[in-house]
């Protein structure tokens, strides 16, 4: 009898570790529901460096705006344990892309969320196509299609 195992490798674009602060707790001792959005924002910094490596944040270099965010709270998180934030690119379109995040604590998925980022011209106030060289860099970190979100 032959056994076949199928392994799936998912590249993590970025992984950061957060040490929750005392002020991140609610009165029940859980991490407050407003906090993961801030952690995900910190994790997106590496994605933003694809477009503006020095993070100069000028309208000439940083032509991105956030159009939509959403979060699903899957399990509780607590103050005294580190949180790992994993970040991928889950979709690349013509003018926008989606960043997908997961917050893990003690081996448990606790929060998952995404942010739609639009390539934007601040002078014309219109979305613009993502430059091909930036798309290629984003594609290097694309979550495989077979991965379930």
Regions found by a protein language model. Name each.
Residues 2-84, 92-149:
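Terminal targeting signals and extreme-terminal segments of soluble enzymes
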């Amino acid at each position: 009898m032959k056994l076949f195992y199928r392994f799936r490798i998912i590249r993590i674009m970025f992984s950061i570790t957060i040490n929750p602060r005392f002020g991140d707790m609610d009165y029940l001792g859980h991490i407050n529901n407003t906090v993961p959005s801030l952690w995900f924002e910190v994790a997106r910094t590496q994605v933003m460096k694809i477009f503006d490596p020095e993070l100069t944040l000028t309208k000439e270099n940083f032509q991105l705006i956030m159009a939509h965010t959403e979060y699903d709270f899957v399990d509780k998180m607590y103050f005294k344990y580190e949180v790992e934030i994993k970040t991928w690119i889950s979709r690349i379109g013509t003018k926008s892309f989606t960043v997908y995040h997961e917050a893990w604590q003690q081996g448990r998925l606790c929060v998952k969320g995404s942010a739609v980022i639009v390539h934007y011209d601040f002078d014309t106030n219109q979305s613009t196509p993502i430059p091909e060289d930036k798309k290629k860099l984003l594609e290097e970190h694309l979550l495989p299609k077979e991965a379930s979100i």
